[in-house]
Each structure stands twice: as structure tokens, then as C-alpha cells.
Amino acid sequence: IRDIAELQEDLGNRVMAGFGGVAEYGITVRWDKNFLKILRLLVQRRTPFSMLGGVRFGGTLSIDDAFERGFDHIALAVGAGRPTLIPIPMGLVRGVRAASDFLMGLQLTGAARDDSVANLQVRLPAVVVGGGLTAIDTATEVLAYYPLQVEKFLMRYETLIGERGEETVRAGWDREETAIADEFISHARAIRAERAVAEHEDRPPHIFRLLKKWGGVTIAYRKRLIDSPSYTLNHEEVEKALGEGIEFAECLNPISVLIDEYGHASHLTLNKQRLTRDGHWLTLDDVEKLPARAILIAAGTQPNTVLAREEPDKLGIDDRYFQAFDMDGVPVEPELSKKPGEVHVLANLRDDGRAISFFGDLHPSFAGNVVGAMASARQGYALISEMLQRVEPANRD
């Protein structure tokens, strides 16, 4: 490949071509994801590299199996486990979903592409619960995806009417489906009309004004904006999200989800909170009710430490994360910093010098976001190299 332009695709119609997973849906949309294909090629073109799918580590392949097959080191980079669910009444009704599930469904299925038949429905108004970068990313993605979703629905609806007639197309819908379809159709026609007027007046279409009119997207966070992880980790993302029209409702703690006559989410009720002079958060009696046809929970995740429960004789747990060891096999408590003075990423050391390391959301120093995961790899690769120097290679080829 002589020119990188040969690899670049339009981001709106791009087919996933990196390593998938959180590399696709956990990185801000402001980063050119064409680079994911380039990163994969940079690794995959190297002769010693191989990538095998369909293998569940801890099931298909155990730790002992891996070492018996000649692997000199095992690096665990399996990311987060299950998302944190908020234990509130009606917290799992239709319309409520994990933010990571929405992002994964959007990015990995290509739901936003015109030629995709992926079923990913989101309605407005939408409320995102949480204050991290995932919450920010989810809010901006919902705002960007909604117009594409309803316009695609209208295009296919009109195509089917042309082929089969309106009565036939609508015959199979129940009352709720009819209401949702009419909502999407009216919104799509309003967007289409705005685009036509904008073209006639030679100006950009004001799609955001329409989205705002239909309820828009609000982030609800239990503390202040300046306390949120997204602000402390990357305030620029917050600034850009607010510039795109995202609303931020601070000092609100969810208490229940209200439903409509069909059992679908209609509102989210929240308690107001206040910061006291001694630095504690006090829950007030005041209750706020936010309209919400889509409620996306971005309240963090649990580390994916199931392997420690499956093989407890080889991996230990320290609080919620894997137990870390130094290079002499002594248990240590890692420094809670993305740039620790001394890096501790080893989870197991064998007598022959071979070892297991752990990164990203598995590690207390680096858990929480993709930036931390990348930092863990950068900080830890040198230690892996040093450990490999101690071991006679199982295969010199």
C-alpha cells in the first residue's frame, strides 16, 4: 500500500475493519476510525502475529492448556464485564438499556448505515444516566443516530407503500407500533422539509432545533458537572457535547422509571441532591420527573474477573480486581495512577518464570475507559518483555 488514501472510507458508511469490540464503540466519534484498520494492518502484517477466533479462554482453553501448548506469557486484556444496573423500580422495562449495549449495537451492527437492516430503535426524549465518558459518547451518538434512524424508516416505509399499498403495510401493526411508526414518519418528514428549505436558502439545515423540539438528549448525573469523571478526565469531550446540544442535568439521582399504557418507559423520576459544607451529598425530598422514551444507563461496569472464579488456584482477587504481584511473586497494591511510579501488572508467576499479566478494566490503576486501557498496555509491555527475557522460549520459530 503506497498511499493511505487507499484504506480510507467514508465514516458514515464504513464497515468495521479493526479488531472490533470496545476499540470500535468505546472511542469518541471525533477520532477517525479509519485508523483502526491501519492499526490492525500494522500488527497483522508481521509474520509472528496470529489471531484466532472462537476460543473462550478459561473454557475452550485453560491456563494450563495454554502453557502446555508452548505459550510463554498470557496477557489478559478482556475488558469490562457486566454493566452496572441501577436497582430502581421498573429499571428493566422496555426503553431502558445499558449504554454500552446501545453503543455496541450501533457500532458493531452498522445500524446507522443506509443499507443496514439492523434493528436498533431509540426514541426521543432520551435520558442518559451517568457522568463518565461513556455517558457523553452515548448522548452524542443518540443525537446523531436519531435523524438517520427515522429517515431510513420513512424511506423504507414509502418503498413498501409503493409496492404493496399503505393499508397492507400498516395492517400488521398493533396500536403501539402504529403510534411509534407515525412518530418516526412525522419526524422524518419534518427533517426532510428542513433539509429542502435549507438547500433553497443555501444554509446548513437546523436539525438540532427539531431534535430539541422533540425532547433532545439529557445527561442526568448525581453530582455536579465539574465532579463528573468525563469533566475531570477529558473536559474537551464535555465541551463539544454541550456544543452539539446535549443537556446536562446535575445533582439528580434516579429513583424510578414510569411507564405508559404499553409498559414502555415514559419518564424517569429523580431525587435532587445538594452538596453540604462538609463535602457530603444530601438527598432532598424534591423530586424531578424527566420525560424519557429512551433511558440509557452509563453507571460503570464490573471488571471481567470470571477467570479468577473458574481457576482460583491460579488467580486471586483484590477487592474487585485481580490481585497484583511484583516480579518476585510478592502480592502488592498497585498505585491508583495512570502513570504509576512502579508498574505492577502481573497476576500470576510460575516457577519456570512464565507469567500472566492483566490490563485495562481488570486493573485498578487503569480501569474505567479506553484511554486508561491504552495506558496500561504502554506501561506494562516493558515488564512483559523483561519477564520473557527470563524464560527460555518454547518455540524459537
Residue ranges and their predicted role:
Residues 131, 222-224, 361:
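Cofactor-binding loop segments of dinucleotide-utilizing enzymes, especially the Rossmann-like FAD-
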Residues 135, 347, 358-391:
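A conserved FAD-binding loop/helix module that cradles the flavin
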Residues 8-19, 30-59, 69, 74, ...:
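A Rossmann-like FAD-binding core segment of flavoenzymes
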Residues 83-206, 319-342:
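Glycine-rich dinucleotide-binding loop and its adjacent helix/turn
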Residues 94-122, 257-261, 277-365:
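FAD-site-proximal beta/loop scaffold in flavoenzymes
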Residues 53-91:
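Small-residue-rich anion-binding loops in enzyme active sites
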Residues 74-76, 98, 128, 297:
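Redox-cofactor binding/interface segments in oxidoreductases and associated redox assembly factors
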